[in-house]
């Protein structure tokens, strides 16, 4: 890019551009030029690649052609959305001076900075997902982490103690933009994330952070927020708040408090668990066939976002959970009436954020009015619900009759997109505005009267009075009659077949009309800004109302799901344990074309580990995951897919289910598996729910079996966690005989000829057969390979003389038995082809074999 070194050689306009660009060197600068935003030099080259737009040249400056790319101002939101989705930030530079009075370039300034984590515009946001700005800080004692949803004002901080917990927080929150200090040591935690922003160290200083936060909240200290003793979290929060203020170029009145998130308040799930349980994102990265896809039939975007937050942070406070359960039960008879009305409320939460930022558009205010219009009916319907929590929500949502009346009087029914287009303020709201509009709108009548009068006065039947945007008002006479034009007609424009004229009276009226239009638009903008001033004093109450409406939407949705999907209300018990009668997988049962086979589960301190065996495809992983999902659903207060559930305290959910190579970090499948296993063994407690699926794959058979055995022993004897341990190592089925609290269960299958039918039914005891070859045949492995595999299996089974004693049906050899040396007689028989022997040779072979025994 052209530099400041040859600054004086540039044109005045480019000097202005370069000054503004120097203030924002690392982000794209959209420089307003008439009806376009233009980008120059390196910005133009980057934008042409990112947006797939043409790269051209705009004249020359300092003797060099200027690379240039441009986008129409009316389409800017679409282009901003593309850039934000790619993690880019953009400074929007507008003309603020009057071209008519400017000497030199029109005055311009950057009015806002659009970044992935600070957007609030409707067109740039995913309506059913939170969009978070985050900051991360680290010192010798651990991490500090803060998140802000600028589109709602929700401000949170936490202090993850270690790397694994920090990784889980990043996975849970998935920020659109992440600020980090220039000396941040754990770059491998955040590398590859979108929207990374390196910030100077001084922005994370604790004293600056306290000062920033107290100034924002109007407080002398932070004790009332419960964050005073969270220095690492405050360092992150201070940097984050300063960045938000810098980018928004305005106050942030909707950010009124900050909340500390503590590990002990919610069930902890690490990054692997969130991924494996497919809570809001499936393993392929999509949203289909996830828990959220089944549970989320909310009717407002803000309700959908709240439900997803609940799913990722199950609460441990049973008082909160029992209140939600009671509310869901009370609402089940009212869902059909409430959901259509709630649907009309829309995304009040984000509209209020735009109001606070003074970026709300006319249609935002119209939607706010529409939301207010639903409140009387909602409150009337809720009055009939016999539930104290529901009545508390009813009071919290308010009614706002005065604000509804204000917006009904002030804003027309269907306003334009932008206030600068005019026609936003309703007739009758302001007398002066009505007068200016009457003058501007009366032009049509005046022109018709003038045309009739001038035709009669001149006798010219081709005379017409009209208007265009370039030349203004005119009197047009055909070429054939133009020589008869009166002497007071002054020629304004010559056309091929006509002449256009102006007269003093029409010129005077034109000035008056154009002045009235300008004054009407200026007054309309002023009145629109005054509406903000009238609404903003109610912002806190409005935010509480939006929160109550979102929570009501979530609870009504969960009530509808419970009724429609035949869920039951779980019971919380004081001791560790999970007892499920006829449990079902909430997602799998929705995608199956046949009835789902429900299964029981019983975990308690006396039966704390289940060794699960059975064939591949038999349903072991489904059974394990459904247990975790039922527990998760219970701990958000939801009803669950089962006939009956009793569930005790849970502090963490761990899953070691499936794995893939982590090529980016140079870790094999086995290394990933062992890392996840180590995390479980270090952090699980007797109150944890642990899912372990086929530990020990990816290494030698004996290594794998030994690791699986030791892990199972540790979980059952030392940690005493509630554990579901699926395995194909049949030796592990001996564990119940060797230690207390361990039991065998299995999923069975039936073979008929070359076909296999999976029963998907959980039974007590160990499986008797692995069915591996049958599953391989089902998958389409060639018959000759299956045939050879059966032959090899018989050979392997014959190696151990103890195999028959270990496995009655002879289908699985004991891996812990020591193979004996093969008998020479057996070896000779294996190499013998009976069909090729003559009677004499056969007799000789009998004597030879006799000598070998």
Swiss-Prot record:
This protein's record includes keyword ATP-binding: yes
UniProt-listed GO biological process terms: mismatch repair
GO MF annotations, alphabetized: ATP binding; ATP-dependent DNA damage sensor activity; damaged DNA binding; mismatched DNA binding
Top-level lineage group: Bacteria
Pfam families xrefs: MutS_I, MutS_II, MutS_III, MutS_IV, MutS_V
Binding site for ATP: 614-621
Matching PROSITE patterns: DNA_MISMATCH_REPAIR_2
Annotated keywords: ATP-binding, DNA damage, DNA repair, DNA-binding, Nucleotide-binding
Keyword Cell wall biogenesis/degradation: no
GO annotation, cellular component aspect: cytosol
Disulfide bonds: none
UniProt similarity note: Belongs to the DNA mismatch repair MutS family.
Function: This protein is involved in the repair of mismatches in DNA. It is possible that it carries out the mismatch recognition step. This protein has a weak ATPase activity.
Protein name: DNA mismatch repair protein MutS
Organism (species): Escherichia coli O1:K1 / APEC
């Amino acid at each position: 890019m052209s530099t400041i070194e040859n600054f004086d050689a540039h044109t005045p306009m480019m000097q202005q551009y370069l000054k503004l660009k120097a203030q924002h060197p690392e982000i794209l600068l959209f420089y307003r030029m008439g009806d376009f935003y233009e980008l120059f030099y390196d910005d133009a080259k980057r934008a042409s690649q990112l947006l797939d737009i043409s790269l051209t040249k705009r004249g020359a400056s300092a003797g060099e052609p200027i690379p240039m790319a441009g986008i129409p101002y009316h389409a800017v939101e679409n282009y901003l959305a593309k850039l934000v989705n790619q993690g880019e930030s953009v400074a929007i530079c507008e003309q603020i001076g009057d071209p008519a009075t400017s000497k030199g370039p029109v005055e311009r300034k950057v009015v806002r900075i659009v970044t992935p984590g600070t957007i609030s515009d409707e067109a740039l946001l995913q309506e059913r997902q939170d969009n978070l700005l985050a900051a991360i800080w680290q010192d010798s004692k651990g991490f500090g982490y803060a998140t802000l949803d600028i589109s709602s004002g929700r401000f949170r901080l936490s202090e993850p103690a270690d790397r694994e917990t920090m990784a889980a927080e990043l996975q849970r929150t998935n920020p659109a933009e992440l600020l980090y200090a220039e000396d941040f040591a754990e770059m491998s935690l955040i590398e590859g994330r979108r929207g990374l922003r390196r910030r100077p160290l001084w922005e994370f200083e604790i004293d600056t952070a306290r000062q920033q936060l107290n100034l924002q909240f109007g407080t002398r200290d932070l004790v009332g927020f419960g964050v005073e003793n969270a220095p690492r979290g405050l360092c992150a929060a201070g940097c984050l708040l300063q960045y938000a203020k810098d980018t928004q170029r305005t106050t942030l009145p909707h950010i009124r408090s900050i909340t500390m998130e503590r590990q002990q308040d919610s069930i902890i799930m690490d990054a692997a668990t969130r991924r494996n349980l497919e809570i809001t994102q499936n393993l392929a990265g999509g949203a289909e066939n996830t828990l959220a896809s089944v549970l989320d039939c909310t009717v407002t975007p803000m309700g959908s976002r709240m439900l997803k937050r609940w799913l990722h942070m199950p609460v441990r406070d049973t008082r909160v959970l029992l209140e939600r359960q009671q509310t869901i039960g009370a609402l089940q008879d009212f869902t059909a009436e409430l959901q259509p009305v709630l649907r009309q409320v829309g995304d009040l939460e984000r509209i209020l954020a735009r109001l606070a930022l003074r970026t709300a558009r006319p249609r935002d205010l119209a939607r706010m009015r529409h939301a207010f219009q639903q409140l009387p009916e909602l409150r009337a319907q809720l009055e009939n619900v016999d539930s104290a929590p529901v009545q508390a929500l009813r009071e919290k949502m308010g009614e706002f009759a005065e604000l509804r009346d204000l917006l009904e009087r002030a804003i027309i029914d269907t306003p334009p997109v932008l206030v600068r287009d005019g026609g936003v303020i309703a007739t009758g709201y302001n007398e002066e505005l009505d007068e200016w509009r009457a003058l501007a709108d009366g032009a049509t009548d005046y022109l018709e009267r003038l045309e009739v009068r001038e035709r009669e006065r001149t006798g010219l039947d081709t005379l017409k009075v009209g208007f265009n945007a370039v030349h203004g008002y005119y009197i047009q006479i055909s070429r054939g009659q133009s020589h008869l034009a009166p002497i007071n007609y002054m020629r304004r424009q010559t056309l091929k077949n006509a002449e256009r004229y102006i007269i003093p009276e029409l010129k005077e009226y034109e000035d008056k009309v154009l002045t009235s239009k300008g004054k009407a638009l200026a007054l309309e903008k002023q009145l629109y800004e005054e509406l903000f001033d009238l609404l903003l004093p109610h912002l806190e109450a409005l935010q509480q109302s939006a929160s109550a409406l979102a929570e009501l939407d979530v609870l009504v949705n969960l009530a509808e799901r419970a009724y429609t999907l035949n869920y039951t209300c779980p019971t919380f018990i004081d001791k560790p344990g999970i007892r499920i009668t006829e449990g079902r997988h909430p997602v799998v049962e929705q995608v199956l074309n046949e009835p789902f086979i429900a299964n029981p589960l019983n975990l308690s301190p006396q039966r704390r580990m289940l060794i699960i065996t059975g064939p591949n495809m038999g349903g072991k992983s489904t059974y394990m995951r459904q247990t975790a999902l039922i527990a998760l659903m219970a701990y958000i207060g939801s009803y669950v897919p089962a006939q009956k559930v009793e569930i005790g305290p849970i502090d963490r959910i761990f899953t070691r289910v499936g794995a893939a190579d982590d090529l980016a970090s140079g870790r094999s499948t086995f290394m990933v598996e062992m890392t996840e296993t180590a995390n479980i063994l270090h952090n699980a407690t007797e109150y944890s729910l642990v899912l372990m699926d086929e530990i020990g794959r990816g290494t030698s058979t004996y290594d794998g079996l030994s690791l699986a055995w030791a892990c199972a022993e540790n979980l059952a004897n030392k940690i005493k966690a509630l554990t579901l341990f699926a395995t194909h190592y049949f030796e592990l089925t001996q564990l119940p005989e060797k230690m207390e609290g361990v039991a065998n269960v299995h999923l069975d299958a039936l073979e008929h000829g070359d076909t296999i039918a999976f029963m998907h039914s959980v039974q007590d005891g160990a499986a008797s057969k692995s069915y591996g070859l049958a599953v391989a045949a089902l998958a389409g492995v060639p018959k000759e390979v299956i045939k050879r595999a059966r032959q090899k299996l018989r050979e392997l089974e014959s190696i151990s003389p103890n195999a028959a004693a270990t496995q009655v049906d002879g289908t699985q050899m004991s891996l812990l038995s020591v193979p004996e040396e093969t008998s020479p007689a057996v070896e000779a028989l294996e190499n013998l082809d009976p069909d090729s022997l003559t009677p004499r040779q056969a007799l000789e072979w009998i004597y030879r074999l006799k000598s070998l025994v």
